[in-house]
Regions:
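Active-site gating loops and adjacent loop-to-helix segments of metal-dependent hydrolytic enzymes
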Residues: 4-15, 56-82, 124-136, 140, ...
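Short, electropositive alpha-helical surface patch
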Residues: 26-39, 100-109, 247-252
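Alpha-helical scaffold segments in soluble metabolic enzymes
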Residues: 28, 32, 77, 102, ...
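Glycine-centered positions in the ABC transporter ATPase nucleotide-binding domain
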Residues: 295-296
Length: 299
């Protein structure tokens, strides 16, 4: 399973991600995750629905023909998961007024991504309960002198979380350092954005009929467009320590406690505490992964 593949790299809990697709496919994905949690499949915390309520101008490798309007029917579908957490990435400027608030009221965690929103639109979305930003600097309106955009809103927010793809390619090292400095280890969330090549002997896969190739820690289309990563969270920690210069303690927090806080599970995962899951790793003196425990069992 996806969870088992990531666990051997030290990621003991995750949200499997479905990118933009038909509502029928989304319904099936939610049912599959619900069944996995009911069966107590180790490591599955819920689901991340990245789309299809995105902005075509920031589509990345998403199929824009799948993009839809966030109506009441869609809201009811997106919040159908009975067990675990639902993280939804959407473009706030495409959401009708009150839609984000309704998603949050129904228990979803909402992040902004693949968005051309203005600073003001993000502030309005935060007032409805927007909690963070999926891939800071990627597929979003950038910071400029008179238009702070999504990036400006994310970096100036005192409370929101920002997911960071720390492969050294998606985001320039200077910008990675800026995120780490402004948001700190408590709100900088290392994300893998990992594709099926991670942990596989194969260096390519097909996405919607197009071949995607893994080169180092990053995945690309044949035209050189970024298409996710070949990155584990342990890899991301290494990049942050080597290239950005943060310490091991902060890197560990960005890969564990911060993600757990971002989705409201800080009491269950992401830290060693009474009552929390016994998920932890052993690193050597050079921060190499030595052993992994999941629910108290060594893998």
């Amino acid at each position: 399973t996806i969870a088992r593949a990531h666990a051997k790299f030290g990621t003991t809990a995750l949200l499997p991600t479905l990118i933009s697709d038909d509502l029928e496919k989304i319904a099936l994905a939610i049912e599959a995750v619900d069944a996995a949690i009911e069966a107590e499949v180790p490591g599955v915390l819920g689901i991340h629905l990245e789309g299809p309520f995105l902005n075509t101008s920031r589509k990345g490798v998403h199929d824009a023909s799948k993009f839809k309007v966030l109506d009441q029917e869609a809201i009811e579908l997106l919040t159908r998961l009975k067990r675990g957490k639902t993280l939804i990435t959407l473009a706030p400027e495409t959401a009708p007024p009150g839609a984000i608030a309704e998603l949050v009221r129904r228990g979803a965690v909402v992040f902004a991504g693949h968005t051309e929103a203005s600073y003001e639109q993000i502030i309005a979305a935060e007032a409805e309960g927007l909690r963070g930003f999926t891939h800071i600097f990627n597929a979003m309106s950038q910071l400029s002198s008179r238009a702070p955009g999504v990036v400006g809103a994310a970096l100036s927010s005192p409370t929101s979380f920002s997911g960071l793809i720390a492969d050294g390619v998606h985001v320039h090292v200077a910008n990675m350092a800026l995120v780490a400095r402004l948001l700190g280890p408590k709100r900088t969330v290392l994300v893998s954005d990992a594709m099926p090549t991670l942990g596989s002997d194969q260096d390519w896969f097909e996405l919607k009929g197009e071949k995607i190739f893994a080169r180092g820690l990053t995945c690309y289309t044949p035209d050189g467009v970024l298409a996710g990563s070949n990155l584990s969270l342990h890899d991301a920690m290494g990049v942050m320590m080597r290239q950005v210069g943060i310490g091991l303690t902060d890197a560990l927090q960005m890969a564990s406690h911060a993600p757990a806080r971002a989705i409201g599970l800080e009491g269950q995962v992401g830290r060693l505490a009474v009552g929390a899951r016994a998920d932890f790793v052993q690193l050597d003196g050079d921060s190499n992964l030595v052993r992994v425990w999941q629910r108290g069992v060594q893998l």
